[in-house]
């Protein structure tokens, strides 16, 4: 998807940019929100390269998860294409590491 991330402050996702939706369809439908990870041109450690066959090129930043009201017209959202299962799997692994739910639940 392409989404307008403004307004934002500090080091938050800025401007109109590509992003990958990481929230479940049920969550999106119930809340009218979607959680995304931005896609950037810059390669950093643990960013995930998009498959070369995609229309969009760049790197998924799984460390900067943000929720957006996708019903808000100012977000100017446009669907581009679906991520591969491999890309989603890598993103999910890093998001799991970020939140460390298994550790929280075992305490």
Mark where each language-model region is.
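Flexible loop residues that form catalytic
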Residues: 6, 24, 103
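C-terminal terminal-subdomain/extension
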Residues: 52-107
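A broad, low-specificity signal marking well-ordered, structured residues that form hydrophobic/aromatic
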Residues: 1, 34, 48, 58-60
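Compact nucleic-acid interaction/catalytic patches
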Residues: 11-16, 20-53
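GIY-YIG nuclease catalytic motif and its immediate N-terminal context
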Residues: 1-9
């Amino acid at each position: 998807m392409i989404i307008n991330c403004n307004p934002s402050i500090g080091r938050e996702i800025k401007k109109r940019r590509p992003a990958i939706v990481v929230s479940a369809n049920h969550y999106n439908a119930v809340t009218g929100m979607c959680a995304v990870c931005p896609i950037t041109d810059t390669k950093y450690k643990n960013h995930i390269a998009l498959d070369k066959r995609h229309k969009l090129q760049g790197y998924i930043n799984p460390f900067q998860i943000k929720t957006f009201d996708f019903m808000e017209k100012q977000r100017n959202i446009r669907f581009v294409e679906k991520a591969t299962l491999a890309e989603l799997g890598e993103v999910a692994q890093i998001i799991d590491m970020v939140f460390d739910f298994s550790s929280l639940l075992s305490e």
